[in-house]
Amino acid sequence: MTPVPVSVDTTADFAAPPTKTAPSTSTRTLLLAPPSIAAHEEKLRDIFATFDRASTDLQMLDRLSAGFVSLPAATYDLVLVLTDTDSARRAEALQLLSRDVYSALVPSMKGGAKLQLQDGTWNSAEGLEAILAGLVEKDGAFEKPAYQEAAVPLRLGGKKKKAPAPTEQPPVATGVGFVDGNDELIDEDDLLSDDDLKRPMQQPANCQPEKAKKRRRPCKDCTCGLAAEMEAEDKARQEKADKDLNVLKLQSTDLSDEVDFTVQGKTSSCNSCSLGDAFRCSSCPYIGLPPFKPGEEVKILNNMVQL
């Protein structure tokens, strides 16, 4: 007999009907409720009758303010603060919308998402924290700006700037503005004759010193001769004073002189040195010294006795 081929049925004996999945929506809503609304179940029932529970989240403002709840980033298209239609809970809700709440709320909003109140629009004073958080007021609500990212090309190593071309200088005439150090200088005294040099110098009236007043000081760049004249007077006065101070000083030639009062027959003009007593004459160079011993050699150096 010829073998008969056998086929295996691989189909399932029981096929369940395909389940219908609800179409996913990209719009999500966040409801922020004050703590007092939890005691009114009918309020929550009415709210969820308006919003789809599958795409709506409910959070309590007090828990969000305390940091017990963390919101997903860039998720919600609408944030609605439940204040009741008659504004019964407006003050309670706005009091809980602190800076910490906005710090957690704004990052969870998508670009272009809105923040609204259930009972109406915001007042100017109520939206200060929202503005500080980066939201923009629009049509009685606050909207998060939709920032777009764009790549900006950065050019590195740009072209080097060309050096400016040198400007042409106008031609300068020869011999103008130049000083030649090899030129011979003329002595001004050669231009004066002997009579001009013997003629007394005439001082200007401004430089002549007044007799009744103090001596006039010469100018810093004096050219009338007053400075040289006063310098000569000061030099002569200094030389005279130095000469008066050197009256009592011995010259270097006097160092070789020796005085010996121990030689027999030598006496002073006052005849007191031979008495064997101390020198007491006021003009004696040995005043105050004890009498010399026989044979002692004495020298005078710069008016000082050298024994």
UniProtKB/Swiss-Prot annotation:
GO terms for molecular function: 2 iron, 2 sulfur cluster binding; 4 iron, 4 sulfur cluster binding; electron transfer activity; metal ion binding. Residues 153-197 are annotated as: Linker. HAMAP family: Anamorsin (MF_03115). Component of the cytosolic iron-sulfur (Fe-S) protein assembly (CIA) machinery required for the maturation of extramitochondrial Fe-S proteins. Part of an electron transfer chain functioning in an early step of cytosolic Fe-S biogenesis, facilitating the de novo assembly of a [4Fe-4S] cluster on the scaffold complex cfd1-nbp35. Electrons are transferred to dre2 from NADPH via the FAD- and FMN-containing protein tah18. This is Fe-S cluster assembly protein dre2. Its main location: cytoplasm. Coiled coil: none annotated. One of its GO terms (cellular component) is mitochondrial intermembrane space. Monomer. Interacts with tah18. Interacts with mia40. Residues 1-26, 159-179 are annotated as: Disordered. Residues 270-284 are annotated as: Fe-S binding site B. A motif (Cx2C motif 2) lies at residues 281-284.
